């Protein structure tokens, strides 16, 4: 649906909603205690009865009470809470938050790695009439201070002493709304208004059930429940206000479109919960369907994730592209150790897997005997080695997945479905599922939502605009930014560019703010160029196109290297794939330093050949890469070039490597 008529239809749909309210609310608000007009459809998907989060949770507890909900590892043993226990713990936490002085529509901040305590505090905050405010564990003290004051955080949950010290380093006068801090991991040092988790959970004993019920009953589906702070890759983080209805409606929509089954799903929680994608798939969807959530170890992103996957065998797995790329590299490394028949079988199976799954993607379900053999001999073993042998939904989100990785997994019978969404759309807006996906597409629009491509060019590329029950309430205390995002007819303008094919599959081509405009006035979207560079030159880990307002395009390149498993810092040593690339050229280099300091002629020549191949596919001379430089370290969360969800922070990179960029232009 790419035309504007849908705008009018969407606007008419609103007439059915909130008709009991004396003053009809608007589609947006910037007030923490504000109410919005819900975007209910007249009938069908999108017309479901609005629910508050307490109603939503209570309904699930009635259906799944004794089923396992949360699993936390204590030593070698998994400790399980069922849905009854989970709900009671949330009520207990809510009473304690009230006792500590949580005010209505004020924040409860959560700073730490995923855990049962994170979930219980998040839900408890909402039951108690506050707002759940996730804070990235990687945030600086300055960003934490901004979020705490902006969200009016009354109570803060921190994981450990390291996070506590970060907060204590902030002058107390700059943390005015904060009344108490709870720490949920030992050891713990004594401090004023600091509580251990166990002590905190006992604080609310004197609060009667009736008092909590009054707060719960006073809540409305069109009021704010969750604040998601954008990671601030381009400036000050914005507080995205999500209503009860945003959360409860989209949890149901995702469940239906992913074809998830009640009481049968298992997920592993490891991505930062302050990001809406992780929060939706780890907290809210499992409540909706009675799924079991296992908590990964805190060092999951540094190497232990696959061990957890092998132990718990999730049925649904969501990863960001860099996670899938790491797993891709691991499988390739292991397969390279195979010899003789085993190696031949792997190549044979991949060829069959790619052909069969490519046809399946187009709706042709032909499974020859050779495919069934490949499944038994190779695919099942690869999946078992990754802990994905029970998994039916393989998902990638937050950034585009590169083609090589997508095709590699497709050939191994692991079709990765990409999704597209924003914090402002409460998570996914389009999804791919096992029966409905295309390589490099973000899938189709969620049932009950609407899409519009605004100001399309001759190629059908336009700004992706969104409509539905999942559209956020507004940015907290920021009317200007809210009205820039939501137009007069209620469409959310994403700032992302995309196109739709004839079947309704969405392809995201870039971001309006990321488009480079050269000194000659040429518009160049960087992502397609960067993706092609990584495809043509296998030793390249990250590529960032530079050239805004400059006379030609240049590129920052990083090489694939090993990572420090404890800190996540990129090491100097090249990884397995990069070393293989070098040996194939006849280079004996084993470190980034050897290649960069000596300007290894074999590697530099191969990179230039790759750049030449990319330039041959350029639409015109203005889109050609004229110069490039290899940086001494790969991009990472540790170095600040990547955000918490491993998204490239272009503005930060441009500042950090200004000297190298300037050198290419002077």
Curated annotation (Swiss-Prot):
One of its GO terms (cellular component) is cytosol. It is a peripheral membrane protein. It catalyses: a long-chain fatty acid + ATP + CoA = a long-chain fatty acyl-CoA + AMP + diphosphate; (5Z,8Z,11Z,14Z)-eicosatetraenoate + ATP + CoA = (5Z,8Z,11Z,14Z)-eicosatetraenoyl-CoA + AMP + diphosphate; hexadecanoate + ATP + CoA = hexadecanoyl-CoA + AMP + diphosphate; (9Z)-octadecenoate + ATP + CoA = (9Z)-octadecenoyl-CoA + AMP + diphosphate. It comes from the Eukaryota. It is an enzyme of class 6 (ligase). Its main location: cytoplasm. CDD domains: ACSBG_like (cd05933). GO terms for biological process: cell differentiation; fatty acid metabolic process; long-chain fatty acid biosynthetic process; long-chain fatty-acyl-CoA biosynthetic process; spermatogenesis. It is found in: Cytoplasm; Membrane. One of its GO terms (molecular function) is arachidonate-CoA ligase activity. Its EC number is 6.2.1.3, 6.2.1.15. Testis-specific. ATP binds at residues 230-238, 418-423, 496, 624. Keywords: ATP-binding, Cytoplasm, Developmental protein, Differentiation, Fatty acid metabolism, Ligase, Lipid metabolism, Membrane, Nucleotide-binding, Spermatogenesis. Belongs to the ATP-dependent AMP-binding enzyme family. Bubblegum subfamily. Catalyzes the conversion of fatty acids such as long chain and very long-chain fatty acids to their active form acyl-CoAs for both synthesis of cellular lipids, and degradation via beta-oxidation. Can activate diverse saturated, monosaturated and polyunsaturated fatty acids. Has increased ability to activate oleic and linoleic acid. May play a role in spermatogenesis. This is Long-chain-fatty-acid--CoA ligase ACSBG2.
């Amino acid at each position: 649906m790419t035309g504007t008529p849908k705008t009018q239809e969407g606007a008419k749909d609103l007439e059915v909603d909130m008709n009991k309210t004396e003053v009809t609310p608007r589609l947006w608000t910037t007030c923490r205690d504000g109410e919005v007009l819900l975007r209910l459809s007249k009938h069908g998907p999108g017309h479901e009865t609005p629910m508050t989060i307490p109603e939503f949770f209570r309904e699930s507890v009635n259906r799944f009470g004794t089923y396992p909900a949360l699993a936390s590892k204590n030593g070698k043993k998994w400790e399980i809470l069922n849905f009854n226990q989970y709900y009671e713990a949330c009520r207990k936490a809510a009473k304690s938050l009230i006792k500590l002085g949580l005010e209505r529509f004020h924040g409860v901040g959560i700073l730490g790695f995923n855990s049962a305590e994170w979930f219980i505090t998040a839900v408890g905050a909402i039951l108690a009439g506050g707002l759940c405010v996730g804070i990235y564990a990687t945030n600086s003290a300055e960003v934490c201070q901004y979020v705490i004051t902006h969200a009016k955080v009354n109570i803060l949950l921190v994981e450990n002493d390291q996070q506590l010290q970060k907060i204590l380093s902030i002058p107390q006068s700059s943390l005015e709304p904060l009344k108490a801090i709870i720490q949920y991991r030992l050891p713990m040092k004594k401090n004023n208004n600091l509580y251990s988790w166990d002590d905190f959970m006992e604080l609310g004993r004197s609060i009667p059930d009736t008092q909590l019920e009054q707060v719960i009953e006073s809540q409305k589906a069109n009021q704010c429940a969750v604040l998601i702070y954008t990671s601030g890759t381009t400036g000050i983080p914005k507080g995205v206000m999500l209503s009860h209805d945003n959360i409860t409606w989209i949890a149901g929509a995702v469940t239906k479109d992913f074809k998830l089954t009640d009481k049968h799903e298992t997920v592993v929680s490891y991505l930062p919960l302050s990001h809406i994608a992780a929060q939706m798939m780890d907290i809210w969807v499992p409540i909706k369907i009675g799924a079991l959530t296992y908590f990964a170890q805190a060092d999951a992103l540094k190497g232990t994730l696959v061990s957890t996957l092998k132990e718990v065998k999730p049925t649904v797995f969501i990863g960001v592209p860099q996670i899938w790329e790491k797993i891709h590299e691991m499988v390739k490394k292991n397969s390279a150790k195979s010899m003789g028949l085993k190696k031949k079988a792997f190549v044979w199976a991949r060829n069959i897997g790619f052909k069969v799954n490519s046809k399946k993607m187009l709706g042709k379900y032909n499974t020859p005997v050779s495919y069934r053999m490949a499944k038994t001999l190779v695919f099942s073993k690869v999946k078992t080695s990754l802990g994905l042998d029970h998994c039916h939904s393989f998902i990638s989100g937050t950034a585009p997945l590169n083609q090589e990785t997508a095709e590699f997994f497709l050939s191994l019978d692991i079709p990765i479905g990409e999704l597209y969404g924003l914090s402002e759309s409460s998570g996914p807006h389009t999804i791919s599922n096992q029966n409905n996906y295309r390589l490099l597409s973000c899938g189709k629009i969620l049932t009950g939502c609407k899409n519009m491509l605004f100001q399309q060019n001759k190629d059908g590329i336009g700004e992706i605009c969104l409509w539905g029950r999942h559209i956020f309430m507004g940015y907290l205390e920021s009317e200007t930014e809210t009205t820039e995002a939501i137009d007069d007819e209620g469409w959310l303008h994403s700032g992302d560019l995309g196109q739709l094919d004839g079947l309704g599959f969405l392809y995201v081509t870039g971001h309006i703010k990321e488009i480079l405009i050269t000194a000659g006035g040429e518009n160049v979207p960087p992502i397609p160029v960067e993706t092609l560079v990584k495809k043509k030159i296998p030793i390249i880990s990250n590529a960032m196109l530079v050239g805004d307002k400059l006379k030609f395009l240049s590129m920052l390149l990083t090489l694939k290297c090993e990572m420090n498993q404890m800190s996540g810092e990129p090491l100097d040593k090249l990884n397995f794939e990069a070393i293989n690339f070098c040996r194939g050229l006849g280079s004996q280099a084993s470190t980034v330093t050897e290649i960069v300091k000596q300007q290894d002629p074999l590697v530099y020549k191969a990179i230039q050949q790759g750049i030449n191949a990319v330039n041959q596919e350029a639409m015109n001379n203005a889109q050609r890469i004229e110069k490039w430089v290899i940086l001494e370290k790969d991009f990472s969360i540790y170095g600040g070039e990547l955000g918490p969800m491993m998204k490239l922070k272009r503005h930060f990179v441009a500042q950090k490597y200004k000297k190298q960029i300037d050198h290419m232009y002077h």
